[in-house]
Amino acid sequence: MATAPPPLAQVAAVSSAVGDDAYADVIGHCRTPVTNETRYTNAHETSHFISSALRRPGVNGFYLGNGQAILLVEPDVTLADVARYVRHRGWRFKTYFVEAWDDRPLYMLDEFTAYIWGATVAVQDAESGRRLERTDAVSGCMEFATYAAALAECVEAEDPGYWASKDGDALRWFLAAMLNRADRLFVAGLDVEAFKSARQDSFLARWSADMAAVNVAERLAGVAY
């Protein structure tokens, strides 16, 4: 069942990035954009800078696009708590769960958002015929979609008061929106030759065979606008 979006924060455009695609959007809304790497990497890293500018104690912010962002209050769980709900660990797990801020569980959504932005730019570039670098451009958003589902399971079980509150409503709306984006991007990029990788295929096979994990993601995604 669709839910109305929570109140969204506004992010002002701060540069005259040329174009009307996702790359121009994310680069144009950051005061210190990354522009010296590939377009995929630039979008990914610039998303982190926007999130950093939005972050404050106990609250994380994530850029959605078109000058809008969402601010989410941290639930009372740790990243280690979330890790216990992760059924299938991809190759990025250690970096973002073991070596990250344990007391900021929504930090992983900063990475999820960054992988979404990178994948969006990569898929748009593929569709427009741009020259593509060899990179697993869409596997990150797929891997983090499974971690986002684990986050939801964890918060629902470990902090039910948060899950039932307006803060929980906002988190569910955001997760649903991002899971839907991740699904569309992964499907769009799955058969792009430059994006293929053995690690991607292996992780997808393990995850898609686990119907319990798939059902959690589908239940969350069904809340999307």
Model-derived features: positions:
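Short pre-active-site segment immediately N-terminal to the catalytic Zn-binding motif
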Residues: V26-N42
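Extracellular-facing segments of soluble proteins and assemblies that are Gly/Ser/Thr-biased and enriched
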Residues: Y85-S128
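Active-site recognition of the HExxH zinc-binding catalytic motif
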Residues: R39-P57
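Non-catalytic accessory regions used for complex assembly or targeting
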Residues: M1-A22, Y225
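Short alpha-helical hairpin
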Residues: S16-A24, R84-W91
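Short, well-structured alpha-helical interface segments that form or flank functional binding sites
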Residues: T38-T41, L106-I116, S139-T146
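Pan-zinc metallopeptidase signature
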Residues: I116, T120-Y225
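Post-HEXXH active-site segment of zinc metalloproteases
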Residues: S52-T95
